[in-house]
Structure formats: structure tokens, C-alpha cells
């Protein structure tokens, strides 16, 4: 026990016992993951179709990123969903276009698809009422 603990009056209050993990609502989380999977499939298909700049290496990289997230989402639905797996999935998800920047001409149809993916991703980050 350090002097700071004594100063703050926490003498003997150290509790290093493990914290019980909060259980996730498996059915609800799988349903959310199913929605995200469908949205990602739609976005990837649209990104890989004309008039998208598929000859641009950066664009191809973004398609690969979303395909990776799609694979992770599919895999998570087939096993017990954990908080760590959800964090890993959602932490790497980013919008297709930078907010506040103009969207390149001809790619406006991708904005609602990307927004849907990000909205569903943010919902996965929030605890459900059944998980309280």
C-alpha cells in the first residue's frame, strides 16, 4: 500500500479479485451480426462494381478491409460472441468516405451503404438492455 492510498483513505480496500465478465445476449448479438453481414456484402458488391475506381490500389485495399470485416462477422455468428471479439471487429471499422469531405463524383450511391455499415457497427458497441 502506497502513501497515496493512505492519503485518499483507501487503506485495506484493495480488491484484486477477478471481475465476473458480463454475459452477452447471444441471440440478439447474432441477429445484429447478421444485419451487419448483409450490409457489408451490399457495400463490398457496390464498391467492386462500376463506376467504382477498382484500378486504384487504395480502393482495392478498402475493399479488402471490408471483405476482412465481412469474414470476421460471418465467423462470429458461428461461435460464442464475446465482448473482445466485438471490440476487435468494431474498432477497425471506419467510414468509406471522410465525414465533411466531398464525395468523389459517381460514388454518391455508396454513401448510404457505408453509413448503414457504420450505424450497425456502432450499435454493436453499445450494451443491450438484456445485457445489463
What annotation goes with each model-predicted range?
Residues 21-24, 28, 41-132:
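Long, low-complexity or tandemly repetitive, helically biased scaffold regions used
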Residues 1, 5-21:
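Low-complexity, charge- and small-residue-enriched intrinsically disordered regions
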